From Swiss-Prot:
It is found in: Cell inner membrane. Key component of the proton channel; it plays a direct role in the translocation of protons across the membrane. This is ATP synthase subunit a. Signal peptide: none annotated.
Length: 261
């Protein structure tokens, strides 16, 4: 059955692009699942680690090129660096207040890493690192654990007051407190799944539509559709990085601001 489908040009495997593979593997098998994709250990260098390293190098290049020759009349690289700096700095200050600005370096690093991971995944033959929960979950957990620790460090036991809705009638406050606690611990789940799900869905759709390009009759339509979706995915890549970052700022505000509702 698989052979017949392949001859029709419709053998589409949109999820193969998300398979984690070892970069150094001796097998010559072309099967989707072989020893290059199984028995992967923490010390193995995979396509995920390679593209995360590339993202870090891109971020470093942007910042180094944008700041090495600062001038009153900025160059293009300096303009890009200043635009990113001003955009994230204003976001942090507006959402978290003046007290949260001291955490701006972490927020900007997080934004640039997610943005580069999203955008690099649109390149041909690349790998979208932010489509994997193995990447987005640690990012979300770092935010969750860091914000929680910071909240207790700055407010002590008073940080728990954020779960007690004083504006609600006393009779329903215990129920609301349970809901608030549950929603708080669900934060890293929604924070990570939102990013990974959006990036995976968009790339899978592109792969499915591109699979029909072999049909000559509809190929012009397919090329146009893929181009349009690529443009949309570029927008989604930026928006998802923004959403991930602004949610981080919102969570940070709970820790550095007033814990009361």
């Amino acid at each position: 059955m698989e052979t017949e489908v392949e001859h029709t040009g419709l053998a589409i495997h949109p999820m193969d692009q998300f398979i984690v593979k070892k970069l150094f593997c001796h097998t010559e098998s072309t099967a989707p699942m072989n020893e290059c994709t199984t028995n992967i250990h923490w010390y193995d260098i995979t396509n995920v680690t390679m593209w995360m390293a590339i993202a870090v190098l891109v971020i470093a290049a942007i910042l180094v090129l944008g700041t090495r020759r600062r001038a009153i009349v900025p160059s293009r690289s300096q303009s890009v660096a200043e635009l990113l700096y001003g955009f994230i700095h204003n976001m942090v200050e507006e959402v978290t207040g003046h007290e949260g600005v001291k955490y701006f370096p972490y927020v900007m690093t997080l934004f640039l890493f997610v943005l580069c991971g999203n955008v690099l995944g649109l390149l041909p033959l690349s790998f979208t690192t932010t489509s994997h929960m193995a990447v987005t979950v640690p990012l979300a957990l770092m935010v969750f654990v860091g914000v929680t620790a910071l909240g207790f460090m700055k407010n002590g036991p008073g940080f728990l007051k954020m779960f007690w809705v004083t504006s609600a009638p006393l009779a329903i406050r215990p129920v609301l407190a349970v809901i608030e606690v549950i929603s708080y611990f669900v934060r890293p789940v929604s924070h990570s799944i939102r990013l990974a799900g959006n990036m995976m869905a968009g790339h899978a759709v592109i792969k499915v539509i591109a699979g029909f390009a072999s049909i000559v009759v509809v190929s012009p339509v397919v090329v146009g559709a893929v181009t349009a979706i690529y443009a949309l995915e570029l927008l989604v890549a930026v928006v998802q990085a923004y959403v991930f970052t602004i949610l981080t700022c919102v969570y940070l505000r709970d820790a550095v601001g007033d814990a009361h509702h």
